[in-house]
A protein has these predicted regions:
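Substrate-binding clefts and catalytic carboxylate motifs of secreted carbohydrate-active enzymes
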Residues: 2-165
């Protein structure tokens, strides 16, 4: 509360926000909701996507979704971007180019890690790491090629009305 009060006293030129997701405890979430100039949130599950947005729109402040795209949970660009556009919600996704952080791999990749290690299901240093069939995050490979040309064409189309025809 003191930090919010100080921040509002300073009155920076940019809006203040603290993401509702990742905040611990109902009182902190409520404080962040009440004090933020812009409501920032993230949601990865398709079934919770629209209800979450409908609830947050009731607050009456601009919304920015700071994390949303997880293909295996149904929150694809094709699913999310039309909703953001229709509701005038800002967004950015986690991951652009598959790289060091390996966010093209699912959270499930590390499940049962010890059992997989015991079975020898790990690559050795110098072995080529094969990409997952369905990427979790990220859009491009290191060489600049798309994970999915259809997906990148959709993004271009919804943002600019452009296509690669």
């Amino acid at each position: 509360s003191n930090i919010w009060n100080w921040a509002h006293e300073v009155r920076p030129t940019q809006p203040l926000t603290s993401c509702l997701d990742g905040s611990i405890g109902d009182s902190i979430i409520e404080l962040n909701k009440n004090k933020s100039d812009i409501i920032t949130f993230h949601t990865y599950e398709a079934k919770k996507f629209k209800p979450t947005i409908q609830e947050l729109l009731k607050i009456g402040r601009p919304l920015i979704c700071t994390e949303y795209m997880a293909r295996e949970y149904g929150t694809t660009f094709e699913f999310c971007l039309p909703i953001f556009k229709e509701q005038n919600i800002g967004c950015y996704n986690w991951g652009l180019v598959a790289g060091k952080s390996q966010t093209n791999f699912s959270w499930k990749t590390i499940l049962h890690l010890n059992e997989r290690r015991d079975k020898g299901e790990f690559i050795e240093e110098g072995d080529k790491l094969t990409e997952p069939e369905v990427w979790f995050h990220d859009i491009f490979r290191k060489d600049g090629s798309s994970f999915s040309d259809a997906e990148t064409n959709f993004i271009k189309q919804i943002l600019h009305g452009a296509t690669n025809e």
